[in-house]
C-alpha cells in the first residue's frame, strides 16, 4: 500500500520550495526577548493508496491525529460527503473502515459536526452547533447535551471567519468553549455529569471590531490556558485561568501585511478575504514544547476575474513560537500545494498538510492517493 515514503532530516525540505527565517520579536507582559535558534524541523511525505471499499477525499477540513487501540498512529478525518469519520492509518499507510454517522434515529446527529476530540481509542466527543455528543467507534450516540442559547457559542472552523475550538477535560468530565455574552467574550464550562453550564473565565481584548468577514478571534486551549489570535493581525495572546496575559505583538517578517477595512458590499467582502492575509489559530504542541500557526497570504493573482483561482493561489506561512511566545521560526511554504480551506491539522509534535490544490493537481482520477506532508518540530531548548 505504500507508494512513497521518505524522510529527510534537515531544517527545511528545499524540494518543497521553502525558505525559513528565524525571527526575533518584541513581547508584551510576560514574553521574553529574542529567540536564540530555530527548532529542528523534520519532513516526511506519505502517500496512502485510495481504498476500493470506501470513498475518501484528497483533503479534509477537520482532522485529528490519534493512537488507535492497536497502537497505530491514525488520522481521524471528518468526511462531509459520506457523513463519516475516515480513518487513515499512518503506521501501515492504508485506510481503515470509517466510522459512519447517522442523521436520524436514536443515534442521529442532525447538524454538521464542526469540532471533535477522539480522547480515547473507543470514545469521541463531537459538536454540531446544537449539541455535544459522546460517540463510540461504531458511531453510536452514548450521550448528548444541548448547549443553552445564551451566552452564544462561536465555535467554528472557517477559512474566511475564524477558528475557535472546544476543549474537553476527561478528568473533570467537562468541556470548555468560547461564547459571546452581550458585549464580552467568555469561556463557558459544560459539566457533562449534570448538563449544567457556568462561566469559567473572561477573555479580555475583544472589542467587536469587524474586518471584512472577521469579527471573532481564533481561540484554542493549552491545558487551562486560552490562546487568542485575531485572524486579521499578527498579534497573539495567552490568558491563564487566573487572568495573567502574555502577548506577542511583533509583526511577521516574511509578510508584513495585515487586513485593512472593507466596505459592507457582498462582492467587496469576498475579495477582501482573498486580497488580505488570514492569520490562523495558534496551537500548543505539547510534545514539541512549541506553539504553531498557519497564515494565508494575500492572493498572488492579479485582477478580479477568477475568485476560485485567487483563493487557491495564496502562499502558506508557518509561524513557530516558544513557550513564552517568542517567534523562533517563520517559513514560507509557497503556493499551489495545499488547500486553503483547512487542508492541514496540528499534531502533538508538529503539523500535517494534505497535498491538495487544483492549480497544481489537475488529476481527475478518483483513485489517486491521499498525500500527507508531515512536519515534526523539536524545540532547540
Cite the ranges covered by each PLM segment.
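C-terminal motif of bacterial Sec signal peptides marking the signal peptidase cleavage site
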Residues: 22-24
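A short helix->beta-strand "capping" segment at the edge of beta-propeller domains
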Residues: 33-61
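Beta-strand-rich domains and repeat architectures in extracellular enzymes and scaffolds
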Residues: 52-85, 289-296, 301
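Structural signature of eukaryotic scaffold interfaces centered on beta-propeller domains
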Residues: 62-70, 114-119, 160-171, 215-222, ...
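Blade-loop segments of beta-propeller domains
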Residues: 94-123, 129, 149-155, 333-340
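Beta-propeller blade signature
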Residues: 184-193, 308-326, 367-380
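Conserved blade-ending motifs and adjacent loop-strand segments that build the rim/top face
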Residues: 252-265, 326-347
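Loop/turn-rich, solvent-exposed surfaces of beta-rich toroidal or solenoidal domains
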Residues: 274-321
